[in-house]
């Protein structure tokens, strides 16, 4: 996307490699660049799940080196209200939500975008996402990042055309190794800093341990498809469809020595249902029902619609057909059965490299 050189751009600075190189690229191109560090989580818990102190220090040092001003904003209360409370509510229902997608929707490309444009008088915001924006026939489209291993368009499907007009993804056309090489070349101390992984407010800690701070344990049985009790769980909401680790079962007399996987969660009966093998038929789905659909400037939107889909991040694209149910729901039918389709996660749609939208998985259509 071509923009005039005298424009003011606010870069979301996280203290990491991607946002730092993003700022450097724009600075080198002679734009009026400023940074903004967002604090989205209050660090009053003794476990220290999400300490932003080191990241802020890194962001300050980077901005000093690049000679750009760094703003600081605390969006913790907004994050709690619009992201974290939803996260807990969905887990209590037995779903597995993706707070990073909701954070993009409610915080980064809503609160941060609006603050930058309205209060800081910026023309654009920029982030270090591996995605691209192209203006084609007068419409702004969201595309996958060039680096297929790092593409983050999956997390951005909630964007709309008005937002896309004001967003820049300066590293979307680069591969990760190139970004790190740039960071080394310009002598950034964070050039070897590891990428952030996992849910942003949990960090490297175990999800189950974190959830137990907010959701009380409710012990129950782990049962096989046939109804045989083979173990105990501490709360069905602590587990996700397709989970293998942390079940505490194995070596069951009369059963094959094959790993067990969660295939269903029954909240009402408080039981966790498991089966053996990562591709057992009970884990497979022929499709799903999705809600909260967002479409991004797609001209050929008519049903049934044939396209590609992802039901989780970094999954290979799946051939599918989308059928209209009503204004709030659609049905997705896969060309081949898909494992571990998980309610609460997002399904995102593509035509070639263009992300045309997505929605929340409400339920799966089992193979059986």
From Swiss-Prot:
Location of the active site: 103 (nucleophile), 200 (cysteine persulfide intermediate)
Start and end residues of each stretch annotated as Interaction with tRNA: 150-152, 312-313
Protein family: Belongs to the MnmA/TRMU family.
GO molecular function, one term: tRNA binding
Disulphide bond pairs: 103-200
Protein name: tRNA-specific 2-thiouridylase MnmA
Organism: Buchnera aphidicola subsp. Acyrthosiphon pisum (strain APS) (Acyrthosiphon pisum symbiotic bacterium)
Chain residue ranges for the region called Interaction with target base in tRNA: 98-100
Principal location: cytoplasm
InterPro entries: MnmA-like, MnmA-like_C, MnmA-like_central, MnmA-like_central_sf, Rossmann-like_a/b/a_fold
Any one Gene Ontology cellular component term annotated for this protein: cytoplasm
Site annotation Interaction with tRNA: residues: 129, 345
